């Protein structure tokens, strides 16, 4: 990698993770990319994690399950070559998510892109984060 070859002090790469709930993640490609970054001695950080569910149909519980699955797919792919040491979500509660102000759902329901709902109660998304950070 040119920067490392030039002696630039590069220690980590943050993967901005604004996901679309209706789109599956290329877990194989992501795992290979992360493994390559780590082979250069770089730490891989998950940053700006949220999941836009505006195109999903179903109950909030059904949407939450799909959102959690996308997060689990992301973190599983990243963890194939080493532990996930840092996860930064782009907000903590659905109540204050930028997604609700930018991408309104056609059914007028609020988006549910973050680990805590609008009442600050944990959702399955939070369980996935806990699964990957319990030993961090």
Explain the meaning of each model-derived region.
Residues 15-24, 61:
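Surface-exposed cleft-lining segments at the edges of enzyme active sites
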Residues 12-16, 45-48:
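Short, conserved beta-strand edge motifs with alternating hydrophobic and charged residues
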Residues 2, 26-86, 91-136:
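Aromatic-rich peripheral "rim/lid" segments of glycoside hydrolase catalytic domains that contact
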Residues 2-8, 14:
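Active-site cradle of extracellular carbohydrate-active enzymes
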Residues 8, 17-20, 90:
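His-enriched metal-coordination microenvironments in redox/metal-binding proteins
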């Amino acid at each position: 990698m040119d920067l490392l070859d030039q002696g630039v002090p590069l220690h980590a790469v943050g993967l901005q993770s604004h996901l679309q709930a209706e789109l599956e993640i290329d877990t194989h490609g992501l795992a290979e990319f992360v493994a390559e970054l780590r082979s250069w001695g770089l730490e891989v950080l998950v940053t700006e994690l949220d999941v836009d569910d505006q195109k999903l149909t179903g109950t909030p519980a059904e949407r939450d399950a799909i959102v959690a699955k996308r997060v689990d797919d992301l973190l599983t792919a990243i963890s194939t070559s080493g532990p996930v040491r840092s996860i930064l979500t782009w907000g903590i509660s659905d109540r204050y998510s930028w997604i609700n102000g930018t991408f309104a759902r056609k059914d007028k329901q609020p988006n549910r892109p973050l680990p805590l709902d609008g009442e600050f109660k944990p959702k399955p998304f939070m369980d996935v984060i806990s699964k990957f950070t319990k030993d961090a």
